Amino acid sequence: MKKNAKIYLLKDRPDYIKKLSDDDIINVIGTKGSGKTTSANKYIYNDDYIVINCDRLYDMPTDSKIEDEFLPKVKELLIKKYGKVYTGKDFSICYDEIINFAKKNKKKLIIEGNVIYDIEPITKLKGTVIVKRTGILKCFLRAVFRDYPTSYFLKLEIEKHGPIIGRLSRLKNIIKRRKSIFKEYHRIEKDIEELENDA
């Protein structure tokens, strides 16, 4: 495993897939820009599945209009029960609630987002884990080009600095924020190692 843990800049590697339990759950993890949402959204119009994009649980501004009809219900349930949607290691509480919600509704579950790999140990996940292993430079560029034009943030920068400086400021800020992808990449490789070592 360590031999393969080097950074792949452009080359994609096959997704890492591991079944942890017989639950009808697919957990899709990977760095920003790795294709998690694209993979999960293939099931969004399939009535057998609930597709939860974790970023949308936190009201992160997006220009995307695609959202599972159950997502607002899940969010409402979490806020009603806990007062908020937990982040970090505490997300495991929300994770269990989301699983129970899917089971009560007799649906298979696809859950995707970076907050999933805050659950420790990663082997606590249920069902199948799919780790997207897209080349790191490709992830970085995808994330920058996807997130740069998000109208909410772009509008704030333009209002603050004017049309030209505002756009440059937005680009600078998004590049700075998306540098975290390189740290995430190594963390995900460690998660794969942990999954590999799990009997």
Where do the PLM segments sit?
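Conserved nucleotide-sensing/catalytic segment adjacent to the nucleotide-binding pocket
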Residues: I50, R56-N114
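N-terminal pre-Walker A segment at the start of P-loop NTPase domains
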Residues: M1-I17
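Walker A/P-loop
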Residues: T37
